[in-house]
Amino acid sequence: MRHLFVIIITLLMLQPIYVKADNSQLYKQLDAAIEKRAHYVEVKEKSLNDIKQGAKYVTSNEDKLKLYEQLANGYKAYEYDSAMTYVKKGLVLAQKSNNILYHKRFQLSQTSLLITRGFYAEAKNIMQKIEPKEEDPLDYQFQYYYTLYGLYNNWSTYC
């Protein structure tokens, strides 16, 4: 029993050495990924441009709303201004076509973008207007509460 205890303590003491070796390997992988940044940007731009090209041939409002949502989501973590542009286009089209669910979804996207920029009070005002109802789809309800969690989590952390 005593030998087992000594072995366990010895292994625990060697653990930081092993972790440090792993970190150097992880740094190498990270450096390699950073070197490929231009390639990743090119792939992302091509993907977004393909969606934009497809949008030229779409005539139904429902399909345009789907494409605007794809573009907004594609730009969300990539380029704030472009994401907000497609969110606003989606809001206008959803309101014009009287599509309540898409209007709420674009407001959620707008709220998420505002949260990333620190506009917590503005995000809260939007969230209060679009609280889900029982008849709303479950994915919308989930997204709403997830966004609300993000709002209050960020607000409490950074303010």
What positions do the PLM features span?
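A "functional boundary" signal
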Residues: 5-6, 16-159
